[in-house]
Amino acid sequence: MYIDIKEIPFLKKINLRLDPNDKNCVSSCSEILGTMLPTKANTYSVNAINEKVIWLGPDEWLIVSDDDNAFLKLLNKTRNLEANVTDVSENRTIIRIRGKYIYVLLSKFLVLDLEKNLSTDSSCAQTLFVKVPVLLVRNRYDAIDIFTNRSHTNYIYNLIVDGTKNLDF
């Protein structure tokens, strides 16, 4: 058994805010992104080019893309819409943790019930990792992406590594 921990670098992270009651804006943004904006709390959708659109709140989403031009494309296409597009790529990083016992390991640092809150392939949750705000995104395989501010990356990474030392494999 193993736990694999690695940083996922160089992905674009774009914050999108808009009025969810503005059907024209929601429809246009969904068309631009190639997938519907998730309206159900703690879910995400994925488009044909594997960009994730993650629900952060009723009027806020995080788009994750490996396209370096994703921000400018979205900004230009939403220019005439009542939408706010912000590049937050330099603010956040992603730690991917993979393995059979990741829920057991992460439960040492979270009060969130992962079995309940990350039960489907398109689920996500915002919570505290010890005292650090994080976004947890379940992947389609046995992995969870932990989105956190860059300044907390080493702290979280070191806690996870320390936490593996007394797992009973």
Predicted regions and their residues:
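Basic, glycine/lysine-rich polyanion-binding surfaces/domains
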Residues: 1-169
